[in-house]
């Protein structure tokens, strides 16, 4: 058949039509039922006429390539992780959502959240993804920048001051800053007054942009030491270690992952998955995965080191803010037997919807 090669990838690419058809049927059967497919059943459903013996020969070649395996003696075949990746890359057809499907997603996320704050909308997005995927729907939200209300500089030592930033909902952030040599108390007050005059109703990134546009005003209104103080105050808040990092994971549909578990080993893998999801580093890793490419990313089993022990698949896409920055991610986690062709466009559209809605509410 000409599929044996020193390069597995070359051999896979050279699979003939009947090998591809048999492989495709095995994977589709697995995704639909989770059960192995044997040569006798395959010979009945193939579009070409092949005996069970001929099918077994093809299956043997596919197994040698690492695309399929036999879960136990005398069983049919299931796809390996490599086989699933090959199927997703080479065979899977992802279509556009129908108008009805888009309207259904819009309705669930918009209406069920009742126009409430962003967190309610994210909850509904996670719940909706869980419902359509039969996996666990997830939404990761990044730390949002508070709307600024007031700033104050309090001298602690001759060369140090406490910069106090008060945001909407009375969030307070304190940072210690180094003072320029020779700065006076009146200059501390002058710098704070200048910031307060320009910060009302703005986030810190917006304030930074505005001050950049107002360079001439800054030069005219403030002396050199006060200008330096303003820049130091903004810089120390911009350097917050939590800025832009995910702070919340919203996950719905964990019970879906309990369905179809075969025994203690599956329960242990599921426990590992839940443990991973509770770690802060895991949230950052998921967001990094979403950022590492355009559109929807698919990670199968151990391709994603985060979930390699639990053998789970992750389908994830980023959502963005008004400045087109990635500020979070939506996705689905589940067993490798996910309906990838259906879930991918759902995740993609949901990410776009969340981007639009969060921009209007943030």
UniProtKB/Swiss-Prot annotation:
Highest taxon of source: Bacteria
Keyword presence, Oxidoreductase: no
Gene Ontology molecular function terms on file: DNA binding
Pfam families: HrcA (PF01628)
InterPro entries: GAF-like_dom_sf, HrcA, HrcA_C, WH-like_DNA-bd_sf, WH_DNA-bd_sf, WHTH_transcript_rep_HrcA_IDD
Keyword Transferase among record annotations: no
Cysteines engaged in disulfide bonds, as pairs: none
Keyword line: Repressor, Stress response, Transcription, Transcription regulation
GO BP, one annotated term: negative regulation of DNA-templated transcription
Protein family: Belongs to the HrcA family.
Entries under NCBIfam families matching the protein: hrcA (TIGR00331)
Stated role: Negative regulator of class I heat shock genes (grpE-dnaK-dnaJ and groELS operons). Prevents heat-shock induction of these operons.
Protein name, per record: Heat-inducible transcription repressor HrcA
Organism: Rhizobium johnstonii (strain DSM 114642 / LMG 32736 / 3841)
């Amino acid at each position: 058949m000409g599929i044996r090669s020193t390069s597995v990838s070359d051999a896979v690419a050279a699979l003939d039509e009947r090998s591809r058809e048999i492989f495709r049927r095995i994977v589709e059967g697995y995704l639909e039922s989770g059960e192995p497919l044997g040569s006798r059943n395959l010979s009945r459903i193939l579009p070409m006429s092949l005996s069970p013996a001929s099918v077994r020969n093809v299956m043997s070649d596919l197994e040698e390539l690492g695309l399929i395996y036999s879960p136990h003696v005398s069983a049919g075949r299931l796809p390996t992780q490599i086989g699933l990746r090959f199927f997703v890359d080479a065979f899977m057809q992802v279509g556009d959502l129908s108008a009805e499907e888009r309207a259904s997603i819009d309705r669930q996320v918009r209406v069920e959240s009742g126009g409430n704050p962003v967190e309610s909308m994210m909850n509904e997005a996670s719940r909706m993804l869980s419902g359509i995927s039969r996996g666990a729907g997830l939404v990761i939200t990044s730390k949002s920048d508070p709307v600024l209300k007031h700033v104050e500089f309090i001298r602690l030592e001759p060369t140090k001051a406490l910069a106090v930033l008060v945001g909407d909902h009375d969030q307070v952030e304190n940072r210690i800053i180094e003072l320029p040599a020779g700065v006076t108390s009146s200059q501390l007050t002058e710098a704070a007054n200048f910031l307060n005059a320009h910060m009302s109703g703005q986030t810190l990134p917006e304030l930074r942009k505005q001050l950049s546009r107002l360079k001439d005003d800054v030069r005219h209104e403030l002396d050199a030491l006060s200008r330096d103080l303003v820049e130091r105050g903004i810089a120390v808040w911009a350097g917050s270690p939590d800025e832009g990092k995910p702070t919340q994971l919203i996950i719905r549909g964990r019970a879906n992952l309990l369905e179809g578990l075969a025994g203690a080993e599956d329960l242990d893998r599921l426990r590992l998955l839940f443990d991973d999801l509770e770690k802060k580093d895991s949230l950052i890793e998921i967001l990094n995965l979403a950022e590492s490419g355009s559109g929807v990313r698919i990670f199968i089993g151990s391709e994603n080191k985060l979930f390699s022990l639990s053998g789970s698949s992750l389908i994830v896409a980023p959502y963005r803010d008004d400045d087109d920055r990635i500020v979070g991610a939506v996705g689905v986690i589940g067993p490798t037997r996910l309906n990838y062709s259906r879930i991918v466009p759902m995740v993609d559209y949901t990410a776009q919807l969340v981007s639009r809605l969060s921009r209007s509410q943030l």
